[in-house]
Amino acid sequence: MLLELQPYWDFNAFTQRPAHLARALSKIAHLDEAQLWALDNDVEQQAHYFADAFPTLFEWQAQCEPTQVNTQLPSIPFWLHTDIPGRKWQQIQGFCAAATQKAHASGTAPAIEWCAGKGHLGRLHTWLCAQPVISIEWQNSLCLQGQQYANKLKLPQQFINADIHQLPLSATTAQSTATQAPHWMALHACGELHCHFLHTATQHKASTIALAPCCYHRQQATHYQALCTAAQATALPATLNLQALRLAQQNQITAGNREREQRANELNWRLGYEALRQTLQPGTPYKNLPSKQKQSHDNFEQFCQWAALKHQITLPATIDWPAFEAQGQQERLQMMRHDAIRHCFRRPLELWLALDKAVFLEEQGYSVTLQQFCASHVSPRNLLLLANRDINAANSPLSKP
């Protein structure tokens, strides 16, 4: 299905305006900016406008969308999360509520926390389960801060500074600990790191695995490297370049109004500048611009002068700046309409990527569930893979990618 509908999601709305989208675009041509924002995060509205164009897409998503976990945690003392931002703390609680049920059976053997950062997840886990935690993190400064937290709270949490990009783990202490650890967990490990996590955990025959994947595009390869044999046998991975992998997580549900306004203004300027550049260099392909930290005194004219300098373009003395800025605003609305079509495929792509990992775990002898550990407004990256090593796992297949 994703392959059949590839022309509707595999394009860059900033630089491309595919003609075959005309029928789908006509469905939302009357929507203003506020309505387009609302459409962007509402599957029911997306189905209302585009179900005729993509009926199988919304049917498949409805069938595959996992349910949300509703497990309640016991009352948690305030001192355990005083330095954790609210939304991050909600994510950690949701993850632990789902994952610690399996970990309780692991006894006093240590758990592994992968891509630990400061070990916020590990601290809650060890408090809930009375189970030691080994928190593995490659940034030494985060390890030091996390260890200070754990020592202050007298929790059995040990940090190991190790290069988790490599397989096997380079640190001898981490390697020996991993062999003994029955429970492995990773909350929002990025791209290659969560793939390394799955390979390493299964190689060490972890009893239970809990993974919330994130940032699928953060990898060295130019295209997605499928994990399970079923996905490897399809043509889809070869089409999933970094742009497609970014699409799977391209969501601004958690962005504040100010952040959205700043992003919209930046796009207005970039598109307005591109319109200006095309009048000076007609027919030339789009030229990338580096990211720019905007200052309070910036305006459209100053932005264009900066961009022209980067492109080594001499601007004419007289330019109708308001006209080009207005053109940029209109182009951004067109971009939003094109993205409204692409964004219908965000969740299906993400589900496919998660199912690839789930089936890989089944192939390694695990029984697997896929569920949501928090609401999408807390984090749009709310998929959680829970795997339990089971000799009968092969008899409980998930829907294959």
Model regions: which residues?
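Class I S-adenosyl-L-methionine
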Residues: M1-H20, H165, A181-P401
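Conserved class I S-adenosyl-L-methionine
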Residues: G107-C115
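Conserved SAM-binding loop
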Residues: G146-Q147
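Conserved SAM-binding strand-loop segment of SAM-dependent methyltransferases
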Residues: K154-I164
